[in-house]
Regions:
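Short amphipathic alpha-helix that is part of the acyltransferase structural core
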Residues: 1-36, 137, 147-181
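Conserved donor-binding loop and adjoining core beta-sheet/short helix segment
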Residues: 11, 25-95, 101, 202-233
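A generic structural signal for beta-strand entry/edge sites
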Residues: 71-73, 110, 137, 218-220, ...
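Hydrophobic beta-strand segments of well-ordered beta-sheets in folded domains
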Residues: 74, 107-113, 221-224, 251-258
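Membrane-interface helix-loop-helix junctions at boundaries between adjacent transmembrane segments
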Residues: 83-86, 94-101, 107-115, 119-127
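Conserved acyl-CoA
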Residues: 92-109, 238-253
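Active-site/acyl-donor-binding loops of N-acyltransferases
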Residues: 114-151, 242, 250-287
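Intrinsically disordered, low-complexity segments enriched in Gly and acidic/Ser/Thr residues
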Residues: 175-246, 253
Length: 287
């Protein structure tokens, strides 16, 4: 059957893209919850319909590729296709989307995407197209089904919140994170569809905060944010314990995290039953 291509037409295509991405990534180990990036980018001043390319066999969507970006930076998506459409169609999607992103008209110069180490098809595709990999750290996960509740007393200074609070993150991070880094984090956190957060207090000040996003279909809960005041290991323990309990109450199957910037954090994770399950790699290319 002949494959036809078209670009973004309207908000309904965001739903189409999201549903296809969820289907395509469901079996990828440790894949995160869909982000808000596509919708936010579509509302931006620099959005162009050519940043999204959809492939159809008749009326059936069989593949798509997209990117989001700001300035010269482009977060370049992978050409997702249904089984049986790998190969040539992926190259066609890549050529259409990447060539536009890298064109003088759009102005992309720096391209990046992240994958987990088990995602061999995605990794090999980006390597073939000139991207270089850099590890951003291990992924640790706790199996919540057999795990017992942490036998750790959780301080009354810890609370579970419905929303992640940016001000708490800033309060914990000030002093060891630059304003430039805070600006980058703020932009990233705005794209995350958080399900709940945990906050630890020392007196009137925030001593730690965790933000969690749960992927509905796989029940993988990922701690996107783990910010703990320096030397506040007790706050980390209390926050993790509360996150474990609340994630289980939300029917999550696994609770995962990237490395935590606190001395002794790996020992804390190991003591609580977390195991290293993957590695995350950032693939980048500059033209």
């Amino acid at each position: 059957m002949t494959i036809t291509f078209r670009n973004y037409r309207g908000p309904e295509d965001l739903d189409l893209q999201n549903a296809f991405w969820v289907q395509a990534t469901r079996d990828l180990p440790w894949c995160w919850k869909p982000t808000l990036s596509p919708a936010l980018y579509a509302q931006g001043a620099k959005f162009d319909p050519r940043s999204r390319c959809f492939a159809f066999a008749g009326d059936r969507l069989v593949g798509y590729m997209s990117f989001t970006g700001e300035g010269e930076f482009v977060s370049l998506g992978y050409p997702w296709v249904l089984p049986g459409y790998e190969g040539e169609l992926q190259e066609q999607l890549y050529d259409a989307v990447y060539d536009f992103a890298a064109s003088p008209e759009y102005g992309g110069k720096r391209f990046a995407q992240r994958f987990r180490e088990q995602w061999t098809d995605q990794i090999s595709f980006f390597e073939r197209h000139g991207f270089r990999a850099e590890s951003t750290g291990s992924i640790y996960a706790l199996d919540l089904l057999p795990a017992a509740d942490p036998q750790i007393w959780v301080s009354g200074e810890v609370e579970v919140q419905d929303k992640f609070c940016w001000d708490d993150f800033c309060q914990v991070s000030l002093g060891h994170v630059t304003w430039e880094q805070l600006a980058v984090w703020k932009q990233y956190f705005e794209t995350v569809d958080f399900d709940f957060a945990v906050k630890a207090r020392h007196g009137a000040s925030a001593a730690g905060t965790i933000g969690v996003a749960i992927r509905p279909d796989t029940r993988f809960a990922e701690m996107i944010v783990v910010a703990i005041a320096q030397k506040a290991t007790d706050a980390l323990v209390s926050c993790l314990s509360a996150a474990v309990r609340h994630a289980r109450s939300r029917r999550a199957k696994f609770l995962g995290t990237k490395p935590i910037s606190l001395d002794g954090s790996v020992d804390v994770l190991t003591h609580m039953g977390f195991k290293r399950v993957s590695e995350e790699f950032l693939f980048s290319k500059t033209i």
